[in-house]
Amino acid sequence: MNVFDGSDEEDNNPFSGTTHLYASGIAAVTDGPDDYDFTEPSINGSSDENAQSNAVAEPIEETDEPAEEIDDDTLQTWRFASAELSRSSAFETSYTNLLGQGKNPEVIRIVDAGQYRDIYGKYAIGYKIEFGGIVVTRRYSEFDSLRQSLCRLLPTIIIPPIPSKHPIIKYLFNPLHAKKDIKIIERRQRLLSRFLNNCHKVREIRNHIVFQKFLNPEYFWKEVLNTPPISILPMNNLLAPPLNPTKPSPIHLLLPTPTVLTMRKHEQLIGRNDVMEIKFADYDSDLIRYKAILQPLNKTVRSIRSNIQTYSAVLSELGAYFNAFSLENSVFQVSALFEQMNRLSMGIEKTGQAIDVNYVSAEIFSEAIMISLEEGSKEMLQFIHEAQRVLHFRNFKQEQFYTIETTIKKRKDRIRELKEADLQAVRLGEALKLNAEESPTVAQVMDSMTRKSANKNHTDKQIMGLFRSSASPNNKSGSDSISSEVEPHLLTKDERVVQVNKLEKELEKLNECFKLIEKDLQQVNESMDNSLNNLEKYFHEKWFLIFRELAHNITSWLKDCSESWKNAKQSIDSI
Amino acid sequence: MSESGTLTNKESDTKILSVLVSDPQKQKTHSQTYITYQVSTKIDGKDEPNCVVRRYNDFVLLHQILINDHPALLVPPLPDKKVLNYLSGDRFSHSFTQKRCRSLQTFMRRLLSHSELSKSRILETFLTSTDWDVYRRSLTGQISTSEVSDVLINAFKHVNRQRDEFVEIKEKSEKLDHNLSHLDKLFHKSVKRVDLIGQNLKKLQSSLSGLQELCCDEKELSNSIKAFNDGTMQLIDSLNDLNKYVDYEYNVDIKDMINYIEALKQLIRLKDQKQIDYEELSEYLTRSINEKNNLLSGYGSGNYFKSKLEELAGINQEMARRDKIAKLETRVQSLTDEVEKSKQVADEFEKEVLKEVEQFEQIKTLELKDSLAALAQKHIDFYDDMVEKWSKIEERLESA
């Protein structure tokens, strides 16, 4: 672990001044970071910093009073009843009981949505989540922050999507209102419930403490956001263990940070003929093709839905006019036709009823299309977007890998060059020595050469010192400073030795990094492969579900309409 | 020439059972292009239907003759000339000729359902005779179409007294007209929507085909998509057929009904016209009688100045008075006759029109029944067919 030995810097802790677990040094943290089970006292030390950074991140929340000062009367009774008394309690047991039921499609339900008073006494739209008999209410913004946290906590996992935010401008003019926006709230209720269940299907999320806390009414969500693991998330996930970014790992900080500009082209990587590489390239192109199909599909479905809605509105009007028509369909009462005309009225009325039934079932049908196909394809598109984001993370990891690999190669080459130059110099020296014995001119030149090199040696030491400090270990890629580019035979022997030593030391660290990134990459590959596979499976199941639902809805729509027209026909035939 | 035989022998009682107007065909001669329709008539006692080919102008001629011959009868209207379609050159389009064919069919059916008009000889000629062409050539341009202007002149005059029945009829026909035109508009809207839905479904289908290609490794899923897509295809086709029916036939029926009511209103206006004639005449008569009575009772006619003037002019007042009375006498006499006559005409017309209204009710009821029944049947056929197909698809998908 002693990467930093030999360095002259006293405090090179990159975490200092951040909210990272290591902010006050590695020793301050006990081992066993694999489980996230941090108890509250352990964060007391850094809670001040947390408060500050969170105040910056969420300025809106700033005005809220701290939870402790809230009068018990303002709390929602059904939410916090006896919660504080038994914090460990029933939830954990029921959660573990339910963990086994991961296969069940609807383990988590959102049973209600509507206005409620949050713990700070503010009115907001809350979603009542029921899970294993335990109920917790969360707001949309809390779902949103849960998702964002999960994305950062599990960078290799495709995190299920949630419905997109209400457009901010709309919100400013017309904030969500429990009574007015029933449609939007219902839709969110449905989609958020889908989100929770999709999360629950993913083992990594299901078992994650943050997700569990979200479902647990005993935790205030704001508190969860301000405590580990969320509060100790690293600034850059690329410089942390990919499967567990909050796990401390100093070597990760030595990794290069690739930017979009320095990214290699995909084709170059595929050229390496790596099995994994090809597989992931396939994933990538599949996702793009999928997206190219889903995007127009989603658009078409939207317009089908809206056309059916308009159609059903026309039908409803039509039904109304048939009704009026049934009352006023004759210009004159002919006594001989009295009976027949009565029946005609009946027939017209029944036709109107048939059209009314058509209207209602068209309405239902359009709703069904919206829920299954429109929202389904939208969700898939969001999923694809997520998958692409995750793949992007992998590309960065990949880039880290290649950067280190090439750097190692460069360093090795350089060492070899330097050593070769050494050998050459020895040979040259011997040759010159032989010559010098014969020629005084050569001897003079040699003399001046050694003196010069001694001078140079002196200045070089300064350069070397500067290099050491400037080429700090975390930008290895940029460490090809001027002196190392100098042609080896222009350096003195001593310089060469110093460089070789330095390079070998660097190489040592690089090799360590390489091992790490190799492992990282393997983990990333494995985890993502798994996640993408699951996504593919999920898509397939989803399609089956969608087609089944649609076919069912189409059939029942057709059946209803057929029935209604048969009724009408009977009545018409009796005219 | 067997047709001409039946023509000359009017009493032979060729009973026409039904008429079918069908098969619009585009005809091209050197000078003009037009559409012909096949008119086939089923005659009692004959197996083979009798077929003739007529064009729209022939129908117009027939219609005109019938109107002129039977002013008191409700002659069913023809579909509009649709000048706009002529201008846009759309009159040879499939949808236009199909719709017109349907309207012409309705026109013929209404004629045949009418107790008087169905016996008309000219109709029989139109339906059966090859002589019709000769008829047409000699008659075209000779028939006046004057009644329109009459109606216009009296458009602002109203009948003073009319029977309660007609008040009711007028009111109700307004309402019926109103309802029907709304139905017409709404059906148009629905046809347009369904058309759009069909187009959308086509797009959806092609998207799903793309998906199927993408998932071709997954046999089951790809089969499901195919099953679904096949069903969608059938849905699109049948929906299209149903929509065509509503557009080409049901909607045309509604339009024709609206026109029929319009013709009825026209007839009632004509009746009002007769009534107005009578009312004006009798008013004139009353005035004349009053004037005569005034003269007889010796109260000076006109004013003082007038009599003074006449005195100065050397006219013998007494003589002039007698003269006037005599003139009024004859006028009253002839007016009384006229009023009597016009009252008879108006009453006759009124009776006739009431009968026509009854006939209209009968024909309308039958027609509405038929078109509703056909509408319902088309829907039932569509839905049943689709239910059957989609139930199978549902099963296939369930088992996947």
Swiss-Prot record, chain A:
Highest taxon listed in the record's lineage: Eukaryota
Gene Ontology biological process terms from the UniProt entry: autophagy; protein transport; retrograde transport, endosome to Golgi
One GO term describing the cellular component: cytosol
Pfam family, any one: PX
Positions of the UniProt region annotated as Disordered: 30-66, 467-486
Subcellular location: Endosome membrane; Endomembrane system
InterPro entries, A to Z: AH/BAR_dom_sf (IPR027267), PX_dom (IPR001683), PX_dom_sf (IPR036871), PX_Snx41/Atg20 (IPR044106), Sorting_Nexin_Autophagy (IPR051079)
Binding locations of a 1,2-diacyl-sn-glycero-3-phospho-(1D-myo-inositol-3-phosphate): R139, S141, K165, R188
Record-level Gene Ontology MF annotations: phosphatidylinositol-3-phosphate binding
Topology of the protein relative to the lipid bilayer: Peripheral membrane protein
SMART domains hit by this protein: PX
Residue ranges occupied by any PX domain in the UniProt entry: 101-221
Principal cellular location given in the protein's record: membrane
Biased composition (Polar residues): 41-55, 469-484
Keywords, ordered alphabetically: Autophagy, Endosome, Lipid-binding, Membrane, Protein transport, Transport
Family: Belongs to the sorting nexin family.
Role: May be required for cytoplasm to vacuole transport (Cvt) and pexophagy.
Record remark on domains: The PX domain binds phosphatidylinositol 3-phosphate which is necessary for peripheral membrane localization to the perivacuolar punctate structures.
Name used for this protein in its record: Sorting nexin-41
Organism encoding this protein: Kluyveromyces lactis (strain ATCC 8585 / CBS 2359 / DSM 70799 / NBRC 1267 / NRRL Y-1140 / WM37) (Yeast)
Gene from which this protein is expressed: SNX41
Curated annotation (Swiss-Prot), chain B:
Keyword Transmembrane: no
Membrane topology reported for the UniProt record: Peripheral membrane protein
Annotated InterPro entries: AH/BAR_dom_sf, PX_dom, PX_dom_sf
Record keywords, A-Z: Autophagy, Coiled coil, Cytoplasm, Endosome, Lipid-binding, Membrane, Protein transport, Transport
Keyword Flavoprotein (UniProt): no
Any Pfam family matching the protein: PX
A cellular component annotation (GO) from this entry: endosome membrane
Binding residues annotated for a 1,2-diacyl-sn-glycero-3-phospho-(1D-myo-inositol-3-phosphate), in chain numbering: R55, K81, R100
PROSITE patterns in the cross-refs: PX
GO MF terms held by the record: phosphatidylinositol-3-phosphate binding
Source organism superkingdom: Eukaryota
UniProt subcellular location: Cytoplasm, Cytosol; Preautophagosomal structure membrane; Endosome membrane
Main location, first listed in the record: cytoplasm
Domain PX: 15-134
Transmembrane segments: none
Residue stretches in coiled coil: 319-356
GO biological process: autophagy of mitochondrion; endocytic recycling; piecemeal microautophagy of the nucleus; protein transport; reticulophagy
Task of the protein: Sorting nexin, involved in the separation or division of vacuoles throughout the entire life cycle of the cells. Involved in retrieval of late-Golgi SNAREs from post-Golgi endosomes to the trans-Golgi network, for cytoplasm to vacuole transport (Cvt), and autophagy of large cargos including mitophagy, pexophagy and glycophagy.
Family: Belongs to the sorting nexin family.
Domain free text: The PX domain binds phosphatidylinositol 3-phosphate which is necessary for peripheral membrane localization to the perivacuolar punctate structures.
Stated name of the protein: Sorting nexin-4
Gene name for this UniProt entry: SNX4
